[in-house]
Amino acid sequence: MLLYLVNFQSMWANYVLELLKDAFAFKIKAKELDIPLAAYNPFRKQFSAQLLLDYVVERYKDGLVFAIIDEDIYDSNYNFVFGLAYPFRGAIVSTYRLKNFERIKKEVLHEMGHVFGLGHCNNYCVMRFSNSVFEVDEKPDKYCENCYREILNNGFYVNPKYVIFKENYN
């Protein structure tokens, strides 16, 4: 896996690198990448998540990619997004609105779930859709058993410590 740090000088970078290694046992190469100016929308004062992710996946064709950025990002259907993913290809997460380790962890795990082929989940699960930081705070930092099984069935690995097993439900 290639981790892109998009114009990113921050404590979050090492945290995300270690999280990806621990959660998914990836061998990771980290590179810094400049933000493409074409991805900036001056009317919205935000970057297009889709254009950024397209830019990142075009530069690395040999495996999965993950990008982290500390800029506000949006997708065409939303005022903002925390991240965006392409199944079986790559993802981007913005720390701009998340601002703390727990939220960033949840959104990294969430977007990687999409990379592994998952959709949104209605269970008590990190794959639950979040439209606000409050909703991010309310969801767990783990996959439910159903999502875990689907990830494994799609040929990927998740460290079981990032899974809520039924016997541990409250």
From Swiss-Prot:
Top EC category: hydrolase
Cofactor note: Binds 2 Zn(2+) ions per subunit. One is catalytic, whereas the other seems to have a structural role.
One term of GO molecular function: metallopeptidase activity
Function: Probable zinc metalloprotease whose natural substrate is unknown.
Active site: E111
Any one GO biological process: proteolysis
UniProt-annotated binding residues for Zn(2+) 2: C121, C125, C144, C147
Subunit structure: Monomer.
HAMAP family cross-referenced by the UniProt entry: Archaemetzincin
Native organism: Nanoarchaeum equitans (strain Kin4-M)
Lineage start: Archaea, Nanobdellota, Candidatus Nanoarchaeia, Nanoarchaeales, Nanoarchaeaceae
EC number: 3.4.-.-
Pfam families hit by this protein: Peptidase_M54
InterPro entries: MetalloPept_cat_dom_sf (IPR024079), Pept_M54_archaemetzincn (IPR012962), Pept_M54_archaemetzncn_arc/bac (IPR012091)
Family note: Belongs to the peptidase M54 family.
Keywords: Hydrolase, Metal-binding, Metalloprotease, Protease, Zinc
Keyword Disulfide bond: no
Entry annotated with the keyword Zinc: yes
Positions that bind Zn(2+) 1: H110, H114, H120
Cofactor list: Zn(2+)
Protein name in the entry: Archaemetzincin
